[in-house]
UniProtKB/Swiss-Prot annotation:
Subunit annotation: Part of the 50S ribosomal subunit.
Entries under InterPro entries matching the protein: KOW, Rib_uL2_dom2, Ribosomal_uL24, Ribosomal_uL24_CS, Ribosomal_uL24_KOW, Translation_prot_SH3-like_sf
GO cellular component terms, semicolon-separated: ribonucleoprotein complex; ribosome
Keyword Ribonucleoprotein among record annotations: yes
Source organism of this protein record: Mycobacterium sp. (strain KMS)
Family in the record: Belongs to the universal ribosomal protein uL24 family.
MF GO annotations: rRNA binding; structural constituent of ribosome
Gene Ontology biological process terms, A to Z: translation
Protein name per the record: Large ribosomal subunit protein uL24
Function: One of two assembly initiator proteins, it binds directly to the 5'-end of the 23S rRNA, where it nucleates assembly of the 50S subunit. One of the proteins that surrounds the polypeptide exit tunnel on the outside of the subunit.
Gene name for this UniProt entry: rplX
Keywords, alphabetical: Ribonucleoprotein, Ribosomal protein, RNA-binding, rRNA-binding
Amino acid sequence: MKVHKGDTVLVVSGKDKGAKGKVIQAYPTRNKVLVEGVNRIKKHTAVSSNERGASSGGIVTQEAPIHVSNVMVVDSDGNPTRIGYRVDEETGKKVRVSKRNGKDI
């Protein structure tokens, strides 16, 4: 999967189209990513109390994963771009490259 944790992405389709956010978690086996502030859902949790008597539960708002095809990585210029790879001559490792401007990501 070409989108990694910590990348800044732009949502290109869906109800949050146009929103930018940072990838909190990537799920490569499911081809999904969790983006900060995008695809917020309300989760209903059971009310329970701990040993001090404080109650927790109710309605919690949190992010839900979205499919990786609905996001594009934002490059160093702030534009959405596709991702390519090249082999670094010094280290011999694969490096992600912006298809828009050719710079490393």
